[in-house]
Design a protein with these regions (language model features):
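Short, function-defining helix-loop hinge/capping sites that tune catalysis or transport
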Residues: 43, 47, 61-64, 115
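Conserved non-catalytic scaffold segment of RNase H-like nuclease domains
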Residues: 1-49, 76-79, 85-92
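Acidic active-site catalytic centers that drive phospho-/nucleotidyl reactions
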Residues: 39, 53, 107
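Short alpha-helix plus adjacent loop in nuclease-associated cores
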Residues: 52-79
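Acidic, Mg2+-coordinating catalytic module of metal-dependent nucleases/exonucleases
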Residues: 30-33, 42, 73-132
Length: 132
């Protein structure tokens, strides 16, 4: 991450304060996360930011052109199943056998990759804001 040159090992409280400071210093006002409600609920210190749920775009036909025609969707366009990070990355990317490594760092990289592969402008994520 630009401005962070080394691994930070500290208490949760101090790390969250450092993240919040970095976000403010870099004029970040929104956070994108897959299943953002989970992260938002586990990071109450960051509730002042606008949280956008990447899943709200990745799992809907109107935002994800790579959803195959034979995938079952509700009338809203949302997939009925199979819209976790792993299946979405397999759908969008070239690695059809992708397997997640669950930790904060790799989860963030996976989520960034989904955002990049969807290719939407940041304003499109206004449709994915949670907790207004």
């Amino acid at each position: 991450m630009p401005g962070i040159e080394e691994t930070i090992v500290d208490t949760r409280e101090n790390v969250v304060v450092a993240i919040d400071r970095w976000l403010k210093d870099n004029k970040v006002d929104r956070l994108l996360a897959y299943n953002a409600a989970f992260d938002r609920n586990h990071l109450p210190e960051l509730k002042s930011y606008t949280w956008c749920d990447i899943m709200r775009l990745a799992a809907y036909r109107q935002y994800n052109a790579k959803i195959p025609a034979d995938v079952a969707c509700y009338g809203t366009g949302r997939m009925k199943r199979g819209y976790g990070v792993e299946p979405i990355l397999r759908m969008l990317g070239e690695d059809k056998h992708y397997e997640e490594t669950h930790n904060a760092y790799f989860d963030a990289l996976d989520e960034l990759k989904i955002v990049q592969l969807l290719g939407h402008e940041i304003e499109v994520y206004d449709n994915a804001v949670i907790g207004r």
